[in-house]
């Protein structure tokens, strides 16, 4: 009896062969990635860290190109040799066009990782004890310690702003901030014990600032922002394309002083006086505030809800206020509003909706007011 020849195993299909090649390619990519990480760590800890002082001229040149102004570093010291080493840059100076020191930073602690080294940046920058003088000139240009933050030409972008927003994390501790607004002509404002952090993960920008204002202003306050930029930016200023939310919290503040430094309110609402607690949220779209909400608990309020409306004097006011721009018109609303006025008007708890449309050609201005639970007795 003749036995049949053994059957040969079936050949793998084309799809299986393609999957095998793809798996091998992915494996080599993973191995190459980890090899690159290992080489980066070795280069960072074996070459850069031991010779960090020798890199001072290179760091000065790189910082000068990134910021667009001459940078001088007095001394570099190694502070930590952990997985992410950190260095202290002492007596960092940013020079103006005449070669004079425009901004002096006594201590800057920089953390360097392989990822940040590849993109010529830092994993974290901590600036301690800095005194920042921020000024908006009469032509609208922004300056920090005499260094221009806004570009000279509308067709250009600010190297200083772009570099700042490219850092993974930027921290300011124990600083002093002085704000001068020549465009609006408001008195200079000095903030002390400033603690600020800026994080830039991906397309997002997360900011927080805590500071102590002058005694007449009130108590320590907090400002926060959660903003996102588009994949393709078109504005000559980085933040012109951002959208997101702003938040402010004041445990005690003088509203009449606070409003001098806020963006101009196109709705015609003016608060001449008022003190108390305030929390506010603002919606931002393409770099402009489009609406907002505020929770308030105020005393001694003197306000005007519109240019054509009489002033309103209130002993106390509490509740939530909101508003938004509707083309040339604007809408104001309240939730859970209660107040007591000097003229005896008492509103226990209620809601208000006000819609104001300004005059347009032959059409007169119109104001619609809707309210519930109004007690005029």
Question: Which residues fall in each region the model found?
Answer:
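Short beta-strand micro-motifs enriched in acidic
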Residues: 79-81, 111-117, 135, 197-201, ...
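Beta-propeller and related beta-repeat scaffolds in trafficking/envelope systems
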Residues: 185-206, 210-216, 224-231, 237-239, ...
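Secondary-structure transition motifs
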Residues: 2-16, 69-70, 86, 91-198, ...
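Outer-envelope beta-barrel architecture signal
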Residues: 121-123, 166-168, 205, 240-244, ...
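Short structured motifs
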Residues: 58, 72-75, 108, 157-158, ...
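Short extracytoplasmic
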Residues: 62-90
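N-terminal type II signal-anchor transmembrane helix
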Residues: 2-67, 132
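Generic short beta-strand segments
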Residues: 76, 90-94, 130-132, 173-180, ...
